[in-house]
Structure formats: structure tokens, C-alpha cells
Regions:
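Extreme N-terminal tail/first-helix region
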Residues: 2-11
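Left-handed beta-helix
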Residues: 10-11, 16-17, 22-23, 28-29, ...
Length: 80
């Protein structure tokens, strides 16, 4: 967890060192967040999601269960 940040990562999920995760974001079961991924504030990352290096998830967005967000993909704010 980044110093001063307030977000939730389920114990079965893993966020690599260097991943940028915004305040209020929740990362659920069996997810893997790569070290160069960026996730905005207030997001929900569903179960079994993979977010690759270089992928961006905007603020207040939701990634549904079993989705992969691949390198270079960018989701804007408020995407569901």
C-alpha cells in the first residue's frame, strides 16, 4: 500500500509494488494488479481481474469479474 493512501485489497488479491491505486478503491478476490498499472479513486475491481502494466482505469469506474485490462488500454472516468 502506498503511504497515505486508503484503499482495500482483498487478502487473496495481489497488487505489485509500484501500482498506483486511488483512495476509496476496492480490489476483490483473486485479482492481480501489475506494478505499472494506474487505478483511479473510488473504483471497484471485481473478482479475478488482471490489470496489466501500462493499463489505466479512471476514477469511479468498475471492472467486472473475470476481465483483463491489457497494456495500453485506458478506461475513462465513470466507466461501468
Amino acid at each position: 500500500m502506498e503511504p497515505g493512501k486508503k484503499y482495500f485489497v482483498h487478502p487473496s488479491a495481489y497488487a505489485d509494488e509500484g501500482a498506483q491505486i486511488g483512495d476509496g478503491t476496492k480490489i476483490w478476490h483473486f485479482c492481480h494488479i501489475s506494478g505499472k498499472a494506474k487505478i483511479g479513486e473510488g473504483c471497484t475491481i471485481g473478482q479475478n481481474v488482471f490489470i496489466a502494466d501500462g493499463a489505466v482505469v479512471g476514477n469511479q469506474s468498475k471492472v467486472q469479474n473475470n476481465v483483463s485490462v491489457l497494456e495500453g488500454e485506458e478506461m475513462g472516468d465513470y466507466v461501468f
